[in-house]
Amino acid sequence: MAVFKGEVTALPPDKSISHRAALIGSLSEGVTEITNFSAGFDNQSTLGVLHDAGIEVSQHEIDGAYGRRIRKVIISSRGLWSFTAPEKPLMCNNSGSTMRMFAGILAAQPFESELVGDSSLMKRPMKRVADPLRQMGAGVDLSPAGTAPVRIRGTRDLTPLEYRLPVPSAQVKSLVTFAALHADGETRIIESIRSRNHTELMLGLETIDRPDGERVIVIPGRKTIVARSFYIPADPSAACFIVALGLLGSNSEIIIRDVCLNPTRVEFIPLLTGAGADITIENSRIIGGETIGDILVRSTRTLKPLVISNPTVVAGVIDELPMLSVLSAFSSGEFELHNAEELRTKESDRINAIVVNLERLGFDCEQYPDGFRVIGRRCRPVGQVTVACFDDHRIAMSFAVAARATGEGIALSDSDVVGVSFPNFFEIIENLKA
């Protein structure tokens, strides 16, 4: 077993906050400065569509903490209606976040536009994007299969509404919020199961917690958004891979600096500590409305099996489920997941991708429509096994962590895909080897 020790100070900036900071900047009057913006492919796609829709965007490197070079993005805008009709379809590449959230802004612009992506994104469902925007008065056309291209006939006359989220989705919540900022009146979004709340925090929106557990987000329409500065903390979803590496490694101790600790983003930590993981939070503080701190992880080779079925918990760890399932399988030999149909509509069908690869590695699995089970029996294969990445960065990194930590002969079909969210993933792992 490999040993990993050291300090991680170059974790990728948070993807979710980077997307939202850029989009909010495009709606703000004045100059928005975003420090420590993500260099990942997805976030660069957001900057690309903003530029192609007429927003002035620039980025350059500056000196950051711990002797690092970091990215600073500057966005200049005149406010809510600063966009111009694009001359060609807006390319979102592999970024579903870009396509879904930017659709909310384009719905309020007085021109026609089209959002497209790579072959993977063009297969992902977009009906949940179209439905609320149509209710608000925008024209939205999809393919016969309900996928991209997303063709939008925008209007300055969007109607405010009360919208109940049909599924817990921070992206849908955000796209409705961005559209509602342009509507003539107050929009209310109701969520029964909480999802990440960065958009509400960054816009300073009023939220109402009902006695029945539902939350209402109140969005006033046509209010001036004044440009401000944003600092992007380290991505907790990326931190989860390093946490798993430390837990699976032998006699390992890793500290991960300046991670976003927003409670809606780090629900994987109480799950793991409840299973016996040695994880500690240090140096917690508030910056720009977000909780930021350091994560200290020490080897915990044998964890209690993870069983995840509560819909609220599933929604809270949806991005971390590939890593959590692989970690639990290699640590305890067991894992069980239910109520996670959403995983089938990500960059890949992640339920199938995880099961296929675990079975290649000798695990006995059962697959369900909404999840799967690792049963606890393993016949370890002889020789090297190549796991399929399915063009999915989280699948690739989850099995890469298992390979590096256990020393087993596991190869990846496509390691370059990690650049979508974590360009320096392999470099960090190599630097942590003791």
Swiss-Prot record:
Q: Where does phosphoenolpyruvate bind?
A: 15, 96, 124, 171, 350, 394
Localization, UniProt: Cytoplasm
- Main subcellular localization, coarse class? cytoplasm
Keywords annotated in UniProt: Amino-acid biosynthesis, Aromatic amino acid biosynthesis, Cytoplasm, Transferase
Residues that hold 3-phosphoshikimate according to the record: 15-16, 20, 169, 171, 195, 319, 346
InterPro entries, per the entry: Enolpyruvate_Tfrase_dom (IPR001986), Enolpyruvate_Tfrase_sf (IPR036968), EPSP_synthase (IPR006264), EPSP_synthase_CS (IPR023193), RNA3'P_cycl/enolpyr_Trfase_a/b (IPR013792)
Highest taxon listed in the record's lineage:
Bacteria
Q: Catalytic center at which residues?
A: 319 (proton acceptor)
Name any one GO molecular function.
3-phosphoshikimate 1-carboxyvinyltransferase activity
Give its E.C. classification number: 2.5.1.19
One Gene Ontology BP term is: aromatic amino acid family biosynthetic process
Give the record's subunit note.
Monomer.
Biological function: Catalyzes the transfer of the enolpyruvyl moiety of phosphoenolpyruvate (PEP) to the 5-hydroxyl of shikimate-3-phosphate (S3P) to produce enolpyruvyl shikimate-3-phosphate and inorganic phosphate.
Can you say what this protein is called?
Answer: 3-phosphoshikimate 1-carboxyvinyltransferase
Which taxonomic lineage does the organism of this UniProt entry have? Bacteria, Pseudomonadati, Chlorobiota, Chlorobiia, Chlorobiales
What gene is this protein translated from? Answer: aroA
